[in-house]
A protein has these predicted regions:
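Charged, E/D/K/R/S-rich low-complexity terminal regions of large eukaryotic assembly subunits
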Residues: 2-172
Length: 172
């Protein structure tokens, strides 16, 4: 999918943009559905994605929601996209989990130990659900982590990086 998306990087004329709009919309939806696609900033940099308008503008707004809100804000606003979710076969629960993966991958790699309570607050989920969430995230290869039940913390060794910033490059 990423190779296909790179086709949208070049400068496109207005006519070419109209032709690629349907494909750009589809790529955004597929990226949202794909568990292992976390770097939405890369998508938002593509001209064809930036140019989504009209009926497809909702898709762009949903994509932006993943990168511009925290987990609590995301949950508060997700219902605005009910029609789009129904059209594309997206569920609120899937989108909330996806947002939690995007959120966890934005954490600094300098800190590795996270108390259940801190993660619950960050991800806007119940503290009782943190272990199950971590198990799912580990199985989906979003994070490489260990669960320390005694200390009630998740030790995150690494996570998928959304976008390598100077700080991340230095820590590598």
């Amino acid at each position: 999918m990423h190779a296909y998306l790179r086709l949208f990087k070049k400068k496109l004329s207005a006519d070419e943009l109209k032709l690629t709009e349907r494909d750009a919309r589809r790529c955004v939806i597929l990226a949202i559905k794909a568990v292992d696609v976390i770097n939405f900033e890369e998508l938002l940099d593509l001209q064809a994605i930036k140019q989504l308008s009209g009926a497809n503008e909702e898709v762009l707004k949903l994509l932006n929601l993943f990168t511009t809100t925290d987990a609590k804000g995301f949950e508060a606003q997700i219902n605005k996209f009910a029609k789009l979710m129904k059209e594309e076969g997206l569920t609120k629960e899937e989108l909330i989990v996806k947002k939690s993966y995007v959120q966890i991958c934005s954490l600094s790699t300098d800190v590795t130990n996270f108390a259940y309570s801190d993660l619950a607050k960050l991800l806007n989920i119940d503290e009782d659900e943190i272990e199950n969430w971590a198990i799912d995230a580990i199985q989906n290869k979003i994070i490489d982590a260990k669960i320390d039940q005694q200390k009630e913390e998740i030790v995150i060794k690494s996570h998928m990086l959304r976008e390598l910033k100077k700080k991340e490059w230095q820590s590598i």
